[in-house]
Structures are given as structure tokens and as C-alpha cells.
């Protein structure tokens, strides 16, 4: 099921959707390619934001049909790079104020995740993105949450399995990401029922 288009558009012109993915392309996630192609066939304007480089040696041939530009969201490996990325991404006073407001929450995350959230916000604004869509409510969901909090660009998230069922899932962050999302997409009725339980009281729309 495709996430809905956002009706609030902070930029002029047609909606532009930013897909936030941990890795792209990934052979085991051809369903994402299928979804992107379906949306492009409907005339939607998409951009892809990848948080990690692919390590796959083979790719689905359908990837060649994807028109969306792929953007690499830099992941700093050194402290100096992390601080540089934060500084370059927070040049606007409004962004710095929003960043300060969510700092207590960001302190729960690794620094490189925070830096990627800031960088995604910068790129999304640069590309006039009107809506973000994350696949998986884990890394991609967290980075999209940060970018949305800094820019006001709304987001949706498609949840899958490991990102909601695995023992490593942080329930606080799962609830935070889903409650602030414009909409949460579940891939099955079972998952939808499960999310209805774990997200109870958050106001999340599944």
C-alpha cells in the first residue's frame, strides 16, 4: 500500500517525495523498487536518500528503470566530521532553535544518526521535498523523524518485521516515530493488530 501524499506543501509546485532508506539498492528489498516504480508510473516525483552504501554484488534488473535520483546522506566516521556536518546543516537560526528543543531526545541516539538526520534535513530542503517516506521504523525512521522535526516536512513510515518485532527494538523510539508520523503503514493485518497494541495511546494512525 502506498503512503498518502501530503496535503501540506511548504514549497511551490507539485509534491516531491523523498524516500529514506537505510541501504539502496539492496537485492533483498526488491519490493521497495517495485513500489517506487509503481509510484513513478503514476507520475509522482521521487528522490531517494540512502543512509548506507550498498554491499550487494548483484542487483535486480528493474533498478535500471528507476528514474528517481539517489542521494547519499553522509555518515561521519570521525568526531571532527560529525561536528562539521552538524555545523553545516544548522546554518539557519530556526533550525538551531528546533535542534536545541529536541536535543534531550537526540541525546539518546548515536552521534552519527543525529548528524545524518541534520544532513537529510538540509538535502530535503535543498531538493524542495514536500514529504518524506521511510521504509522501516528503525534507522530510516529515526533519521526521517529528525529531519521532519527540523524542517516541518511531514513523513510517513512503512513498518516491516525486524523493526517492530526484534528484541533490539527500542519501544520508546518506535512509539515516538509512529506517533509523529502522518501515517504508519503495516504490511499485514497481523502487524497492524500488533502495532495497535504497542502504539496504544500514542495517537498513531496505522
What are these regions (language model features)?
Residues 71-72, 108-109, 119-139:
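Short N-terminal targeting/anchoring amphipathic segment
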Residues 1-76, 127, 153, 179-183:
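N-terminal subdomain of nucleotide-sugar transferases
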Residues 23-25, 108-111, 159-165:
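Short, flexible loop segments at the rims of nucleotide/cofactor-binding pockets, characterized by
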Residues 28, 140-143, 192:
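Short, well-ordered alpha-helical microsegments
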Residues 155-182:
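A conserved, positively charged/aromatic
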Amino acid at each position: 500500500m502506498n503512503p498518502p501524499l501530503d496535503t501540506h506543501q511548504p514549497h511551490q509546485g507539485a509534491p516531491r517525495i523523498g524516500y529514506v532508506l537505510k541501504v539502496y539498492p539492496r537485492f533483498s528489498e526488491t519490493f521497495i523498487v517495485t513500489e517506487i516504480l509503481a509510484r513513478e508510473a503514476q507520475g509522482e516525483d521521487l528522490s531517494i536518500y540512502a543512509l548506507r552504501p550498498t554491499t550487494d554484488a548483484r542487483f535486480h534488473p528493474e533498478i535500471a528503470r528507476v528514474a528517481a535520483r539517489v542521494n547519499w546522506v553522509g555518515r561521519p566516521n570521525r568526531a571532527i566530521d560529525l561536528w562539521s556536518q552538524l555545523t553545516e546543516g544548522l546554518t539557519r537560526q530556526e533550525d538551531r532553535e528546533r535542534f536545541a528543543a529536541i536535543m534531550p531526545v537526540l541525546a539518546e541516539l548515536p552521534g552519527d544518526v543525529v548528524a545524518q538526520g541534520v544532513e537529510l534535513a538540509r538535502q530535503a530542503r535543498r531538493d524542495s521535498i514536500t514529504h518524506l517516506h521511510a521504509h522501516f521504523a528503525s534507522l530510516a525512521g529515526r533519521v526521517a523523524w529528525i529531519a521532519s522535526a527540523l524542517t516541518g516536512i511531514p513523513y510517513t513510515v512503512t513498518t516491516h518485521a525486524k523493526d517492530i518485532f526484534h528484541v533490539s527494538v527500542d519501544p520508546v523510539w518506535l512509539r515516538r516515530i509512529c506517533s509523529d508520523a502522518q501515517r504508519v503503514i503495516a504490511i499485514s493485518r497481523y502487524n497492524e493488530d500488533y502495532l495497535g497494541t504497542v502504539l496504544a495511546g500514542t495517537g498513531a494512525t496505522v
